[in-house]
Amino acid sequence: MERTFLAIKPDGVQRGLVGTIIQRFEQKGYTLVGLKLMRVSRELAEQHYGEHKDKPFFPGLVNFITSGPVVAMVWEGRGVIANARKLIGATNPLNAEPGTLRGDFAVDVGRNVIHGSDSPENAEREINLWFQTQELVPWEPALTSWVYEM
């Protein structure tokens, strides 16, 4: 089953959106297999955003993600990477559709509430960066047969 990494950023945590965000993914039928509230170290932030290291906005990304608590999550399900991106919405909230998390809860690209992996390769990299294998709990909800055609 496909997995993706999501992180509720400090603005989402501070604004009390954690439960709402988790609920959206549960209601879609995805399974939460990893969850932790954490303070992100500069080292982890720099590794996570490493692809942007030479860009002018890199220091701002690192400073923001380390500015407060983050909820790191791993979700599992068919098509979870692409569908999570749809649920999250465009990176710039001004371009995000209403009904998406960013369309409903964010107004500034620098405070866009949530991060989600954008590809299977990045999902694997980010999951391995943020979680140890033993922190992930594979399980099958009783509702699986009501979500997926077997």
From Swiss-Prot:
NCBIfam families: PRK00668.1. Pfam families: NDK (PF00334). GO terms for cellular component: cytoplasm. Homotetramer. It comes from Thermosynechococcus vestitus (strain NIES-2133 / IAM M-273 / BP-1). GO terms for molecular function: ATP binding; metal ion binding; nucleoside diphosphate kinase activity. Keywords: ATP-binding, Cytoplasm, Kinase, Magnesium, Metal-binding, Nucleotide metabolism, Nucleotide-binding, Phosphoprotein, Transferase. It is an enzyme of class 2 (transferase). The gene is ndk. This is Nucleoside diphosphate kinase. The active site is at H115 (pros-phosphohistidine intermediate). InterPro entries: NDK-like_dom, NDK-like_dom_sf, Nucleoside_diP_kinase, Nucleoside_diP_kinase_AS.
